[in-house]
Each structure stands twice: as C-alpha cells, then as structure tokens.
Amino acid sequence: MSMLQQVSVAKKANVYFNGKVISRSVVLADGSKQTFGVVLPGEYEFSTAQGEIMQVISGKFDVLLPGKTEWVAYAEASQFELAPNVSFSIRTDQISEYCCQYI
C-alpha cells in the first residue's frame, strides 16, 4: 500500500452527484494539493479549474476526454492528464477509487 507522509486532510468530504462521488482534499508538505475519491457505478461529467493528473487507484474508468468522441478505458494504476478549464466524463460499472493531482 502506498502511503503519503506529513499531510493535512480536510475533515469535510467533497460530495458530488447525490453522494455517488465522494473525495477528500489533502495538502502535502510542499503545499501541493491532491484529492482522493471513491466513485460509485454510473456516468458523471466533471469540469477542471486547473490542470489535473487523474490516477486510477482501484477499479476502472471509461473516460470521454475533452474534444474526443470515443471513450478510453483506464485500468487500475493507469492515469490521464487534463488541461485547465475543460469538461470530461467518467463512467464505471464498479466502485472505483482515484487520486487527482493538481498541476
């Protein structure tokens, strides 16, 4: 199990889509921010305010990246990068976890 050291964790969860996507914000010792979340089965559209690297921690996601028309499968331990100010969609048929690193 990969562990983070010397972090601050927000007490309150970020809850989206009526509780079907829930994440926690973490601030690392260097001041950078990440969120760790759980996604229940379904399809969801998100928007970015800044660049992001999304890593699949467990489960799998199909992702419709900005400007694309075909879904791309991302399995556990894979990742994809998003530019600032874009929208993208995620769908999954199982409980899945992710880490979002802001860049």
From Swiss-Prot:
One of the record's GO molecular function terms: uridine phosphorylase activity
Source organism, top-level taxon: Bacteria
Cross-referenced CDD domains: cupin_PpnP-like
EC number: 2.4.2.1, 2.4.2.2
GO cellular component: cytosol
Transmembrane annotation, as ranges: none
Signal peptide bounds: none
SUPFAM superfamilies: RmlC-like cupins (SSF51182)
Catalytic activity: a purine D-ribonucleoside + phosphate = a purine nucleobase + alpha-D-ribose 1-phosphate; adenosine + phosphate = alpha-D-ribose 1-phosphate + adenine; cytidine + phosphate = cytosine + alpha-D-ribose 1-phosphate; guanosine + phosphate = alpha-D-ribose 1-phosphate + guanine
InterPro entries listed in its UniProt record: Ppnp (IPR009664), RmlC-like_jellyroll (IPR014710), RmlC_Cupin_sf (IPR011051)
Key words of the record: Glycosyltransferase, Transferase
UniProt entry tagged with the keyword Transferase: yes
Task of the protein: Catalyzes the phosphorolysis of diverse nucleosides, yielding D-ribose 1-phosphate and the respective free bases. Can use uridine, adenosine, guanosine, cytidine, thymidine, inosine and xanthosine as substrates. Also catalyzes the reverse reactions.
HAMAP family: Nucleos_phosphorylase_PpnP
PANTHER family, per the entry: PYRIMIDINE/PURINE NUCLEOSIDE PHOSPHORYLASE, PYRIMIDINE_PURINE NUCLEOSIDE PHOSPHORYLASE
Family: Belongs to the nucleoside phosphorylase PpnP family.
The protein, known as: Pyrimidine/purine nucleoside phosphorylase
Record organism: Shewanella frigidimarina (strain NCIMB 400)
Lineage of the species this protein comes from: Bacteria, Pseudomonadati, Pseudomonadota, Gammaproteobacteria, Alteromonadales
